[in-house]
Amino acid sequence: MSAGGPCPAGAGGGPGGSSCPVGVSPGGVSMFRWLEVLEKEFDKAFVDVDLLLGEIDPDQADITYEGRQKMTSLSSCFAQLCHKAQTVSQINHKLEAQLVDLRSELTETQAEKVVLEKEVHEQLLQLHSTQLQLHAKTGQSVDSGAIKAKLSVHSVEDLERELEANKTEKVKEARLEAEVKLLRKENEALRRHIAVLQAEVYGARLAAKYLDKELAGRVQQIQLLGRDMKGPAHDKLWNQLEAEIHLHRHKTVIRACRGRNDLKRPMQAPPGHDQDSLKKSQGVGPIRKVLLLKEDHEGLGISITGGKEHGVPILISEIHPGQPADRCGGLHVGDAILAVNGVNLRDTKHKEAVTILSQQRGEIEFEVVYVAPEVDSDDENVEYEDESGHRYRLYLDELEGSGNSGASCKDSSGEMKMLQGYNKKAVRDAHENGDVGAAGESPLDDTAARAAHLHSLHQKKAY
């Protein structure tokens, strides 16, 4: 039994998987390593004590039980202590970084103040020298004392007050400018933090919805194992249930892809793919052939995700504006690429698909099929909106730094990692059964119609 110290505060479990704390100094890393060593020592001592309790005479089982209860409480306290220590450490290093920045800004401000004071002194000397030269040119023999004597005491005091007032006003302006800069930096940091939190919420909701569907499919498979059914009928129903799970995985990834796109440019379905026709085919459109013209110096202008190793087809996750894929107008986010120039991509892995797509030149023919995830969604209107109507997005536009060259390899770390941790068994079962298909929670007897279209489309092959 282990204390199982949790991840450092700020580590996320969103679509991008667990994220390490940003900006942790080397001291913070060593602190986490120290905690890890301490946790291992605690686990070792915990196991030793548990073994000692197991050697107590069975007649004294009450002592063993109470001892293990106390050990459980001790383990829980140690885990919470580790979590709090990690949180405090991260906050401490964040404050240290802010302190370094403030010290640097203070040093620069003090240096600027000294420079300005020297410049003012030099300007006054130059003004005094210029006045003396002016009087010398006009033939007047006047020294500095005579110039000062021309000013009345009242005028000197007024001049000093005016200079002091100007200085106060300029200090206020400089202070406001400095505060604005600090607030802008803080706002940018908070926006990035909110973007990460929104990504975690978005990914968690997608994963929870997918797991709910997959759990229903797995329960039906367990029920199928309890039936007295063998031979082709058993295999057919089993494959249909796998088809349910696979298509829902497909649709979940498409939702993640669409969540990354700009809300000002809503995703459009291909012509002829209205909601009524898509509902009849469970959100899966017909196979389309799209021609794309690409110059040698250009990329395709698309980003892809998925692959055989993830249990989903090669999906278009993003179309870059102004690139060949955008100009042709026939490709859409959510399209599954079945083939390109006659090369079958149904059974290819992600890296293989990237290589094949990057090698295409000139006139390229895509064989794609469109899948609409919202058709099968039971809460399509509010799935990613909160009570205020704000839609959860994966990333802010200014935080995205992806390139547009070729078939950009996003390696599904943004859209797929949230599924990899949950459905490795599902992917393994899918590869063994060699099947793809539809998603849903319908009873066993109702799954045939939902999976038939996908079976005919992909010849019962896993992507």
UniProtKB/Swiss-Prot annotation:
Ubiquitously expressed (at protein level). Expressed in dorsal root glanglion (DRG), spinal cord and brain. Isoform 1 is preferentially expressed in whole brain (at protein level) and cerebellum. Expressed in spermatocytes and spermatides but not in Sertoli cells and spermatogonia. One of its GO terms (cellular component) is Golgi membrane. SMART domains: PDZ. The modification N-acetylserine is found at residue 2. InterPro entries: GOPC, PDZ, PDZ_sf. Residues 289-372 form the PDZ domain. The keyword Protein transport applies. The modification Phosphoserine is found at residues 402, 405. Residues 85-201 form a coiled coil. CDD domains: bZIP, PDZ_GOPC-like. Disruption phenotype: Male mice are infertile with globozoospermia. Spermatozoa display a default in acrosome formation and are unable to activate oocytes. GO terms for biological process: autophagy; protein transport; spermatid nucleus differentiation. It is a peripheral membrane protein. Homooligomer. Interacts with FZD5. Interacts with FZD8. Interacts with GRID2 and BECN1. Interacts with CSPG5. Interacts with CLCN3. Interacts with STX6. Interacts with CFTR. Interacts with ASIC3. Interacts with GOLGA3. Interacts with NLGN1. Interacts with RHOQ. Interacts with MARCHF2; the interaction leads to CFTR ubiquitination and degradation. May interact with CACNG2. Interacts with CCDC62. Plays a role in intracellular protein trafficking and degradation. May regulate CFTR chloride currents and acid-induced ASIC3 currents by modulating cell surface expression of both channels. May also regulate the intracellular trafficking of the ADR1B receptor. May play a role in autophagy. Together with MARCHF2 mediates the ubiquitination and lysosomal degradation of CFTR. Overexpression results in CFTR intracellular retention and degradation in the lysosomes. PANTHER family: GOLGI-ASSOCIATED PDZ AND COILED-COIL MOTIF-CONTAINING, GOLGI-ASSOCIATED PDZ AND COILED-COIL MOTIF-CONTAINING PROTEIN. This is Golgi-associated PDZ and coiled-coil motif-containing protein. It comes from Mus musculus. The lineage of its organism: Eukaryota, Metazoa, Chordata, Craniata, Vertebrata. The gene is Gopc.
